[in-house]
Amino acid sequence: MPRNQGFSDPEYSAEYSAEYSVSLPSDPDRGVGRTHEISVRNSGSCLCLPRFMRLTFVPESLENLYQTYFKRQRHETLLVLVVFAALFDCYVVVMCAVVFSSDKLAPLMVAGFGLVLDIILFVLCKKGLLPDRVSRKVVPYLLWLLISAQIFSYLGLNFSRAHAASDTVGWQAFFVFSFFITLPLSLSPIVIISVVSCVVHTLVLGVTVAQQQQDELEGMQLLREILANVFLYLCAIIVGIMSYYMADRKHRKAFLEARQSLEVKMNLEEQSQQQENLMLSILPKHVADEMLKDMKKDESQKDQQQFNTMYMYRHENVSILFADIVGFTQLSSACSAQELVKLLNELFARFDKLAAKYHQLRIKILGDCYYCICGLPDYREDHAVCSILMGLAMVEAISYVREKTKTGVDMRVGVHTGTVLGGVLGQKRWQYDVWSTDVTVANKMEAGGIPGRVHISQSTMDCLKGEFDVEPGDGGSRCDYLDEKGIETYLIIASKPEVKKTAQNGLNGSAVPNGAPASSKPSSPALIETKEPNGSAHASGSTSEEAEEQEAQADNPSFPNPRRRLRLQDLADRVVDASEDEHELNQLLNEALLERESAQVVKKRNTFLLTMRFMDPEMETRYSVEKEKQSGAAFSCSCVVLFCTAMVEILIDPWLMTNYVTFVVGEVLLLILTICSMAAIFPRSFPKKLVAFSSWIDRTRWARNTWAMLAIFILVMANVVDMLSCLQYYMGPYNMTAGMELDGGCMENPKYYNYVAVLSLIATIMLVQVSHMVKLTLMLLVTGAVTALNLYAWCPVFDEYDHKRFQEKDSPMVALEKMQVLATPGLNGTDSRLPLVPSKYSMTVMMFVMMLSFYYFSRHVEKLARTLFLWKIEVHDQKERVYEMRRWNEALVTNMLPEHVARHFLGSKKRDEELYSQSYDEIGVMFASLPNFADFYTEESINNGGIECLRFLNEIISDFDSLLDNPKFRVITKIKTIGSTYMAASGVTPDVNTNGFTSSSKEEKSDKERWQHLADLADFALAMKDTLTNINNQSFNNFMLRIGMNKGGVLAGVIGARKPHYDIWGNTVNVASRMESTGVMGNIQVVEETQVILREYGFRFVRRGPIFVKGKGELLTFFLKGRDRPAAFPNGSSVTLPHQVVDNP
């Protein structure tokens, strides 16, 4: 049983392992733990071949796909073989027409009929008029039979009077080799039909010629000639097999590159799509598109901007919904922090589904508050109706939490209609938000509402057109802001029947009585997948409603709808369906290969007609560099050709010593060239200097061409020297008269020296490292040298050969007539009385026809090589474009979520109820607000409806963000901005135990090392104050920061897997928020525990005293005033503040 050999097998040579080492990509960052590898098994049906030449892909399905691809690629070369056959028919027609007589009519008609068949077959195959099965299964064998019939017809009809063992042997060897390079069949059938053709041809010639022999001496000569024929055929078969192997190896490499490129492209597209979906779940598409456009600008364009880019847009006539959980404090007391976050995650995931169904754009989640907007970014006439239906559904959904927790929690919902300014502020941790007076009103509508009811304003009421029953809301009695503004409010009672009809038309019938969607009622208690403190996930169940989600995606165009595609992650995970996935991937690969094969990529790229070189010099240079380098197999073919050439010449003329000398010298020289060419392929087996020299030849075009020319020159010179030596040996002592007897040697059958020249043409074709123009030059060298010898130096030899052949084979009267003809100048072939064209001309024409055929094939191979190169370039460019888009999307995503969190959500599709969370024991939290910005903000026309005020706030927040680029603040993470409040935390890193400093556990560190990040956070707060001072000095404003800080443990995580919102929760966060809200402008307020730690780092404090904090009672607080010792920054420098004005001395 054959051994299954992978890429790392030491017996598998470096050449092949390098070319087939295609380990398909895995992405460790995305949690893909499996790599897709394709192994190559050294097995096959043609067991007579060496083991390393029997290549088969594993699995079998991939091998079958490759065989289809390979035969499809070879199908076009089938047309090349048809052209070869047509050229042979043209040759026969010319040879018969030149010396036309009655006995030439039969071969002439057969050749003409064959030529017509070749043309018809060419048209049918070229136009694709034949069924695919016939074209691939029948036509190759039909063409083989047609060519064989033409050769035997020419042999039997044209040489009927004087058969010789060398008749049509050159053409037979030519077509045998052509079968290997053109037929779209597996290697085994080609070997079989080639052997059958050669055996039949040899038997026919042997039997026919043997019947004409007159003595035993002629029988020995016939045996040597038959053996010479065998060596010619053997050479054609061996070199043909090597050619097939080299083509197979090249196509396997191209096939694997195509498969790898497809998987990489699919991988990149999938990741890019995931990033885009994640991005669009956080940001509206119009904002994300604008951000991507700006990110692609070069730095010079960005430097010309006077202000930081702000993505802010005005949206009028939208409905704003605020919803708050009533009784959240009671709920917090009944649950641990992690249980509370789980519960919120599940509840808000339900809200996100409802938001998708009712065309809402969720804006933010602020603790237990959820707010969204309808009519943004795309305007809807029924925005108010949708928002109210959303509110009713949320009230219904909270009943599940009430039943599960046995608490009195409820939802208080407020809706207001008006104008908002929507966008993002700052340069880091982007979150979409809205600002306007109407947003404030909507917030107050929620605050002044009643639990379990939907509270709406007069402006929302005006948009309902009486579609809901309402009652007075009396919101002013519960909210001073509403009372001061004189806003009339209402409470929704129930929907009228018309609303159901509207819901059915606009929401696809998703509403039920009381306005609550049926899907909001839980079918079973939901169990949540969460991450433990070590970051590992565990799943305890799911109630993800996939059908509802798909319906919501179909109903809401703004909801991210991922494209249907084959997911590589699923390929890695779904073990049960592995074979089905492999089939699907192979099908996609086949479609991709068909698509690129049908594209005329070479025609699209400007190339010169004659040379086929690219008109673009840079493209031509790239092609030259990437062109297939020297192949050991190609130079090995030259060695095989020279060996068979020597055997043929020795068999024909065993007494000529020059044959032996040229063989030994030529083989030594060719072995030197072969070893030098293989040193770069097997660097471990050769000295370093030789490897370096071989590599230099590979890299240099002119050196490669020179090396190839040397090989062909050696073959040509060996043949030329042997021909001239033979001529001198046999022609010198004798006087050339018609009646002279010759003693064998080249004089008996000089055609064989032309046949070995055909082998030199075959060796030229095998030089894959040179262009078709170089091959044409070398083939002209071979053909020109043989032509010169045939027509000049060897002219007497061929004349004597024809003279003796016709004299011996015919009757005395016919022989006398032919001798008279041969003795006249009519030997040039123009005299119609000659039975055959003189051998010196027929052999010369044969060489030119074969050279022309091989040149046509070389152009085809060159075109194929350039096509493969362009495919590779296009795939590379396509991957670069996808990668570039992925890079920008990734930059956006990681600017909205921490990198380790984004990586988690890009790994695979998450359920809405799935929770990502991590616990941290020792972190710092900071809130920094601009209390007097509210006085600065106005929506007057002079401020462009408030946009210019927000532009100034954007500059402030952007400058705060730019501080985070300093390496000193690498452990500080911006959490979010809430209006004009900036929230950040320190030590929130993926590693729970180390907080990102070292790999050692916290038990191994001192308190000062463990809390260094808290000191950095305090430095960051001081830097923010300095930054704001610089801004005030330049803008003549007097903004002041009110900052609160605290330290302790938190739970960090993401609520909503499909629309992720990253935040931190816990008592530490609550206290930090209270430190800010109860603080004093211009100061940083901390509690006593935080003050004790920060004192160790040289920070100065002033005692404020006990203050009352809601939910905590009285707390002793301190104001941080500065630092005695300056912070140690890299290179001893201090923080470079944005907008800092440096006075020059």
Swiss-Prot record:
Q: Cofactor comment in the record?
A: Binds 2 magnesium ions per subunit. Is also active with manganese (in vitro).
UniProt-annotated glycosylation sites, renumbered to this chain: N735
Protein's membrane topology: Multi-pass membrane protein
Q: Which InterPro entries match?
A: A/G_cyclase, A/G_cyclase_CS, AC_N, Adcy, Nucleotide_cyclase
Q: Give the Gene Ontology MF terms in alphabetical order.
A: adenylate cyclase activity; ATP binding; calmodulin binding; metal ion binding
Pfam families assigned: AC_N, Guanylate_cyc
- Cofactors that this protein relies on: Mg(2+); Mn(2+)
Q: Which residues carry this modification: Phosphoserine?
A: S524, S579, S1077
Reactions performed catalytically: ATP = 3',5'-cyclic AMP + diphosphate
Q: What is its main location?
A: membrane
UniProt xrefs under Gene3D superfamilies: Nucleotide cyclase (3.30.70.1230)
Query: Which key words tag this protein in UniProt?
Result: ATP-binding, Calmodulin-binding, cAMP biosynthesis, Cell membrane, Cell projection, Cytoplasm, Glycoprotein, Golgi apparatus, Isopeptide bond, Lyase, Magnesium, Manganese, Membrane, Metal-binding, Nucleotide-binding, Olfaction, Phosphoprotein, Repeat, Sensory transduction, Transmembrane, Transmembrane helix, Ubl conjugation
Q: Kindly state the tissue distribution recorded for this protein.
A: Detected in the acrosomal region of epididymal spermatozoa, the acrosomal region of round spermatids and in elongating spermatids. Detected in cilia in the olfactory epithelium (at protein level). Detected in olfactory epithelium neurons. Detected in brain, testis, late pachytene spermatocytes, round spermatids and elongating spermatids.
Its biological function? Catalyzes the formation of the signaling molecule cAMP in response to G-protein signaling. Participates in signaling cascades triggered by odorant receptors via its function in cAMP biosynthesis: specifically activated by G alpha protein GNAL/G(olf) in olfactory epithelium. Required for the perception of odorants. Required for normal sperm motility and normal male fertility. Plays a role in regulating insulin levels and body fat accumulation in response to a high fat diet.
Q: What is known of its domains?
A: The protein contains two modules with six transmembrane helices each; both are required for catalytic activity. Isolated N-terminal or C-terminal modules have no catalytic activity, but when they are brought together, enzyme activity is restored. The active site is at the interface of the two modules.
Query: What family does the entry list?
Result: Belongs to the adenylyl cyclase class-4/guanylyl cyclase family.
For this protein, the record's PANTHER family field holds: ADENYLATE CYCLASE TYPE 1, ADENYLATE CYCLASE TYPE 3
The identity of this protein, by name, is: Adenylate cyclase type 3
Write down the species: Mus musculus (Mouse)
